[in-house]
Amino acid sequence: MYELHIKPGQLTLSQLRKISRHALKVSLESSCIEAIHASTQVVNQVIAENRVAYGINTGFGLLANTRIAPEDLETLQRSIVLSHAAGIGELMNDETVRMMMVLKINSLARGFSGIRLSVIEALMTLVNAQIYPCVPKKGSVGASGDLAPLAHMSTVLLGEGEARYQGNIISGAKALEIAGMQPITLAPKEGLALLNGTQASCAFGLEGLFAAEDLFASATLCGAMTVDAALGSRRPFDDRVHQVRGHQSQIDSALIYRHILDTHSEVSHSHTACEKVQDPYSLRCQPQVMGACLQQIRNSAAIYEIEANSVSDNPLVFAEDGDIISAGNFHAEPIAMASDNLALAIAEIGSLSERRMALLIDNSLSKLPPFLVNNGGVNSGFMIAQVTAAALASENKSLAHPACVDSLPTSANQEDHVSMATFAGRRLKEMAENTRGILAVELLAAAQGLDFRSPLKSSELIETAKAELRERVDFYDKDRYFAPDIKQANQLLIEAMHNKLIPEGLLPSL
């Protein structure tokens, strides 16, 4: 259980990673309460003075010019939640929903949304009770915010919809009963405040970010293992090479390879006088490719961290000036572009891994037994495992197509440009799973290759990592049912055991 004390607008990437991985006990910094109350007072004043303000006493979208009678204001807020809960498809997992809820709490608590403290506290109560609304994955275009996902999240506050508790789907009414809550009657502006925002897109993006960091760590280890398994040179990782180019992420990537490979090993000493002049690109250019991927991970992380702490509601309430401004912070273009760029990194990490693995099974390049098995012909070894890796790499190439360039107008052309940030973030998990599968195959292949170099040893870190794998998967001495080996290697990667190999501060959330 992770105890999270929210100081609105100050969540860190390290905290966000923990939110994605652990059940929570959430509390709120008391200093934010005054700003929350002040924003609701501005909304109340607008109603008392009978002034027109979007979403408070008007319709929504193209119906913004429709004035709502005072007696219908509460009905308006309830109606927007119920009508906008129109998502479709598989449900988000609990971790994504929890992240979305915490991001919404963090945003609302900054005091620019005109929503009562009691509503924010109701969301916190659900999080603390580990009750997560059932939210379909599909149905948002990332402007005006993530309306459908956040509406599904909000239905439970009304005693409607469904929630998941201890792995079981229950009614919204039952969820409130378990949490010791009563259904909420939303005040003016509150339904819109709950629905408007980029929290679903950001939650998907953060989920992809943390997966990408884990993949980067594992891929660097696999790449280093493959260098020694293929009798590759350490010279391309020399710091001087990368300093003269100047890209910090490339410099850092080379540093990580040097850290894992160490200065030398018995394997590297064994071929210092070989006739090879230089290695194929998949070995030699790893810092350049992985450095570029690291840069995209860092860029995306910076954007996600800002967005996680942002106010993406509309309209915004500026209590100090008594102003309510209708604008467009709900437009998730920054997240869409961040997720698109992160998708490129995830795809390239997998693509490079597949090429390294293909090099290992090619006897003409690696000088290892063909397909990494003795008695080839009788045994096929890693032949089809490489085909699996190629299939996954190819899938990721299609999934990496930018989402943000594909806008479709909605709401009768009132919302005529949208971000598609939700899909941009959502596909990252599938891409990460594909890349993890590729890395699992390379991890097996690199360990197999190193075993063929026995009794020569690689670096201490690589030998330790290989031993961890060998606790789960034996040397492939002859053909056997291969899928369980890949599954075991994949599980090792899921456990993110290789993050410990990355020096502190080089990955954004670690």
Curated annotation (Swiss-Prot):
GO biological process: L-histidine catabolic process to glutamate and formamide; L-histidine catabolic process to glutamate and formate
Modified residues (2,3-didehydroalanine (Ser)): S144
Modifications the protein undergoes after translation, according to the UniProt entry: Contains an active site 4-methylidene-imidazol-5-one (MIO), which is formed autocatalytically by cyclization and dehydration of residues Ala-Ser-Gly.
Keyword Ligase annotated: no
Enzyme class: lyase
Catalytic reactions of this protein: L-histidine = trans-urocanate + NH4(+)
The protein's Enzyme Commission number: 4.3.1.3
Protein name: Histidine ammonia-lyase
Organism, scientific name: Psychromonas ingrahamii (strain DSM 17664 / CCUG 51855 / 37)
Lineage of the species this protein comes from: Bacteria, Pseudomonadati, Pseudomonadota, Gammaproteobacteria, Alteromonadales
Gene behind the chain: hutH
